[in-house]
Amino acid sequence: MSKNFEWVTPDSDLLERESTKVQPPKLYNVVLNNDDYTPMDFVIEVLERFFSHDIDKATQIMLKIHYEGKAICGTYSAEIAETKVAQVTMYSRENEHPLLCTMEQA
């Protein structure tokens, strides 16, 4: 009892299915940059609080920031990366630290 239906519109005889490929979202790295004023303990706190790193991983990233000038804290979709940058920047300013948090395409 299977019935096949054809959808007809006034302008065309038959609607056709159009195959579309969904692209995965572009990913962005959230980066913390070194400065001479933000304490190392504060950077570790930020990494634990906003990026869910454990103390060991947060310490490794903090040392990379200190010695190499910057380090990737996490990779996210654009909206999440923007939110992380805004949260870290706001938290840093509230605590009177000039910590620079940016995002760049992965």
From Swiss-Prot:
Disulfide bonds: none annotated. Pfam families: ClpS. SUPFAM superfamilies: ClpS-like. One of its GO terms (biological process) is proteolysis. Belongs to the ClpS family. Binds to the N-terminal domain of the chaperone ClpA. Involved in the modulation of the specificity of the ClpAP-mediated ATP-dependent protein degradation. NCBIfam families: PRK00033.1-3, PRK00033.1-5. This is ATP-dependent Clp protease adapter protein ClpS. It comes from Vibrio campbellii (strain ATCC BAA-1116).
